[in-house]
A protein has these predicted regions:
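Extracytoplasmic
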Residues: 11, 17, 484, 503-666
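Active-site lumenal/periplasmic loops and adjacent helix-entry segments of GT-C-fold
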Residues: 111-255, 523-534
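Hydrophobic, aromatic-rich transmembrane alpha-helices
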Residues: 213, 393-420
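Membrane-embedded, hydrophobic transmembrane alpha-helices
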Residues: 1-98
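Transmembrane catalytic cores of multi-pass membrane glycosyltransferases
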Residues: 1-3, 135, 244, 248, ...
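Membrane-interface helix-loop junctions at the exits of transmembrane helices
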Residues: 45-48, 116-124, 149, 224-243, ...
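Membrane-helix boundary/interfacial segments in multi-pass membrane proteins
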Residues: 7, 56-64, 126-132, 239-252, ...
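Membrane-embedded helix bundles of polyisoprenyl
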Residues: 38-51, 108-117, 167, 196-316
């Protein structure tokens, strides 16, 4: 039951906030902001500690992580102390931002977090459920790999899907964290994954938006309240990332992006104003943060810098046009901001996969359709499943109102530019045909409109919150001005309370719109095991559940990973010849894969079977014919079915676990 996951979620919250809070203290992040930046810093500590431990050969565990993290925190504190002693002016704990009381965005985050947590629970169906997607076999198998090998390093985790399990880079921030929950709390891999999904969507995402809200100059309290409160009205995040892929690392990365952008907002303000006292603290926090984001998912870094780029350009323009600055001051500040721009462009250019990985997805909409869906948040519709969900008209209207509000006030116009820029990238991915331009613009997101659709939610939430808060504040001002002069103060005081309630009510109602309900239902279908499930149906799960009772721990099961059997490693803790659908089976199994039916006449087959203890073959169904071009690689296995080479051991419907009995006496 969900109640049984409460201790797991509480542990995850402590793990996500505790180490990062300590690092925030070491870096002298202001106390009022520290908790909201803590998760970003925690995931940096988790991923970097895993690399350090992997290099030293020390097994990954909660104790080893805490030990390395403590050393890293102490090193950061020591650096700040040394600099503060030598140059006190560079070690200030005062950061720029706004003067909105923290209670305002926190109150909004409590409501928004609760709504998204409830929505996400409905999306993932249950605490023991798992995503019926091909990529999820990698994510779940990676947790088993970490537990078995004691190595959680991003430098080696790619071995999970490598033919001979040779080390390869794969950003492991998500998997490192899930493995700590799994190994420490004694739960299942599926439940540890679901708990981390709930943490990312329902807690880290609104918390990250609080950090961002407190960084925006001249933001009004009602707007700071509305920004994290309104997130329940946007189903594309987390919904699309939970449905497609499945894209767990992107989910976590996007949840942390607002807090990293908030760091960049503060950094740009410091450089614009020449207030360098907080520069060291901000720069170190940004370096730690970018390490955390990159090791969760590199395109989270690209997403953050794309969002922040208009702000940096606006900062350069302000410095150049300023009449109050001397020429030397302009050059220094412009140079500092120019370095930030170079970093942004470098991230966008270099943090992208190869062309083959980036050129998979086709456009699904016309440019006009894509523009309409962007403006009214019908982002779930641009997919290969041809969904026709209702757009989020309320959220879209509030975002447009927020853009109009900023234009009218001539304030924070860079937020509109960020919204337009990210929206343009989504339109490119959803509507522009394959080619060099499409690759140039959206390759960091694999040209995948799902990833960019989920990213569009971030600027849309900001504008919708600003629009809602600005509208309610304008309504309050209009009412107060029409009250008798002696009663205006009382009307304004009472009205502010009413305005807070109104903002929260509208934010709550936004989560009840048809688009949210339709998306939630569609996502939940992907987490159910039924007789017609697309990756693992009930018969296949029956076979997998019996495997630990039949197959000895040290044996290997011959399989075709495209049929869902790749999940056996994570769910049944037994080794396979193929752990992922893109897995290239090791040449050491060549005779088995191609000549299994000839095991009684071809001695090489039984030699491999006995040498590698590959005494079993599992045959499941590939219901949707995933990877049709790859199926020829497994024809040799299918040809052995019905011969005297194989003996059925357990069956559920047509799904069968076989013993390669022809080799038992060889």
């Amino acid at each position: 039951s969900w109640l049984a996951t409460i201790p797991l979620l509480l542990f995850a919250v402590v793990l996500a906030f505790g180490p990062g809070y300590a690092m925030g203290w070491a870096l002298r992040i202001p106390a009022r902001l520290r908790a909201f930046y803590a998760p970003l810093l925690t995931f940096a500590l988790v991923a970097v500690s895993a690399i350090v431990l992997g290099k030293t050969g020390i097994p990954w565990s909660l104790i080893s992580f805490v030990s390395v993290a403590a050393v890293l925190v102490a090193a950061a504190a020591g650096l700040m102390w040394l600099v503060g002693r030598r140059w006190p002016a560079l070690a200030s704990a005062s950061w720029p931002g706004n003067d909105v009381p923290v209670a305002w965005p926190v109150a909004g985050a409590v409501l928004g977090g609760f709504l998204v947590l409830h929505m996400t629970e409905d999306m993932v169906y249950g605490p023991e459920a798992f995503s019926q997607s091909l990529d999820n076999s990698f994510h779940m198998n990676a947790i088993r790999w970490i537990q078995e090998h004691g190595d959680a390093s991003s430098l080696t985790l790619g071995a999970v899907s490598a033919a001979d399990q040779q080390p390869a880079f794969y950003p492991a921030g998500w998997h490192d964290f899930v493995s700590l929950i799994y190994s420490t709390m004694g739960t299942s891999i599926a439940t540890a994954t679901i708990v981390t999904v709930l943490l990312a969507a329902g807690i880290l995402w609104p918390c990250s938006l609080v950090a961002f809200s407190l960084s925006i100059p001249k933001l009004r309290p009602l707007q700071a309240l509305a920004i994290p409160a309104i997130i329940g009205g946007f189903a594309a995040f987390p919904g699309l990332l939970l449905r497609w892929g499945v894209l767990f690392p992107n989910l976590l990365g996007y949840a942390l992006v607002p807090s990293f952008v908030a760091l960049m907002v503060c950094l740009v303000q410091v450089m614009m104003r020449g207030e360098y006292t907080a520069l060291l603290s901000l720069c170190l926090a940004a370096l730690v943060g970018v390490a955390g984001l990159a090791l969760v998912h590199p395109n989270a870094v690209v997403s953050a810098v794309v969002f922040a780029l208009p702000l940096v350009l606006a900062g350069v323009a302000w410095v150049v046009r300023s009449r109050e600055l001397a020429s030397r001051q302009k050059w220094v500040r412009s140079a500092l901001l120019g370095l930030v721009i170079l970093g942004c462009v470098g991230a966008w250019w270099f943090l992208r996969p190869g062309a083959s990985a980036s050129n998979t997805w086709e456009p699904m909409l016309t440019e006009g359709e894509a523009l309409y869906q962007f403006l009214f948040l019908g982002l779930e519709n641009a997919n290969q499943l041809r969904d026709t969900f209702n757009p989020s008209y309320l959220a879209g209207f509030l975002a447009l109102w927020g853009a109009g509000y900023l234009l009218y006030k001539h304030r924070n116009l860079w937020l509109i530019a960020s919204w337009v820029l990210i929206g343009y990238l989504w339109i490119v991915s959803a509507s522009v045909p394959r080619g060099e331009f499409r690759l140039l613009m959206v390759a960091p997101w694999y040209t995948d409109h799902f990833r960019l659709a989920a990213l569009v939610v971030f600027p849309s939430v900001i504008l919708a919150g600003i629009g809602l808060g600005g509208f309610v504040e304008g309504l309050l001002t209009w009412v107060a001005r029409r009250a008798p002069r002696p009663a205006r103060l009382k009307v304004a005081t009472v009205g502010m309370g009413v305005a807070m309630v109104l903002v929260l009510v509208v934010a709550g109602l936004s989560s009840r719109v048809p688009s949210v309900q339709e998306t939630t239902l569609a996502v939940s279908q992907e987490y159910r095991v039924t007789p017609t499930s697309v990756v693992l149906n009930q018969d296949e799960m029956n076979v997998i559940n019996e495997i630990p009772k039949i197959v000895p721990k040290g044996d290997v099961i011959v399989n075709n990973p495209w049929d869902g059997s790749a999940y056996i490693y994570a769910l049944a803790d037994r080794h396979l010849t193929g752990y992922h659908f893109e897995f290239e089976t090791s040449p050491k199994y060549s005779a088995i894969m191609h000549n299994l039916k000839d095991a009684r006449t071809n001695p090489e087959v039984c030699r491999e079977v006995n040498k590698y203890k590959a005494h079993w073959y599992v045959h499941l169904e590939n219901q949707l014919n995933f990877g049709p071009d790859a199926q020829k690689n497994y024809d040799g296995l299918v040809a052995a079915i019905g011969t005297d080479v194989l003996t059925p051991v357990y069956s559920s419907g047509p799904m069968t676990l076989y013993r390669i009995s022809a080799c038992d006496n060889n």
